[in-house]
């Protein structure tokens, strides 16, 4: 009965899309393996056969051959059949082999694989309505999240996001008190401390494991004008702070209005709050695109369960949009709110008392 109602061309198109998704899903594991074994970095040194790449990396040639074949089929490496050698184009190397590149993406796959380990818990949460706290996820989520967002922060935070705010760059250069709330493993906090040595920067997060990793990163960097403390967004120590930041985490909070209110209370009268959120339009119909797809999926696995696990449990989700964020910030006591700048992956808001 159903077969008579199915358009064969549309069916084939959908099955083809499904096949692409299946390939992409298992390919995520290939990317993580390649990064952890240094296969991309070694291949960036020059074209190689499977055996040559195995020698460079101290790995098994047969496994490497199969891995390279999967990469070539996915368009992640180039293959020369005449020479039976593989290589990385400059664009592939920029994205896969250079961790300092603003386009470095393997961390996103680590985050994705870590998130998928929580599927059994999230499946049950659909039935029970329960939450799942950030700290309950696999450690690949914490590592991958930092490594997913860090390239974008490194490329934009100091060079374009802070300059887009009214008067903030000059304050930071002169010397200001800065609070980075929900700092995770401290990537954004460290960037600000390094860029503005006259300012005192403190990062807060309720996840103790991430704070310990942030402290270790600070020790390795040698930067002395920052510290990290374990604290919830509604309980971190009062300032007054000249500049408060939240990076890609306000929507994860159970009570973002309460967090906004605490930010307002902790700020100097002429302070600024910078809110960085995943790029989103206000309406679902305008988010039906590749970026929205990624964020809605992560929101189902990570963001919504995180918010639901906390008091209030507002569950804004990773695609809340500007209008919803304006409501939250205004309810927290701020009178001025604007979109300061944006990238394809982030929206940057400026709020003032």
Feature annotation, model-predicted:
Residues 332-353:
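Core SAM-dependent methyltransferase catalytic element
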Residues 115-251, 256-258:
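Conserved adenosyl
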Residues 276-331:
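C-terminal alpha-helical "lid/dimerization" subdomain adjacent to the S-adenosyl-L-methionine
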Residues 257-269:
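A short glycine-rich, Lys/Arg-flanked "PGG" loop and its adjoining helix->strand segment in the class I
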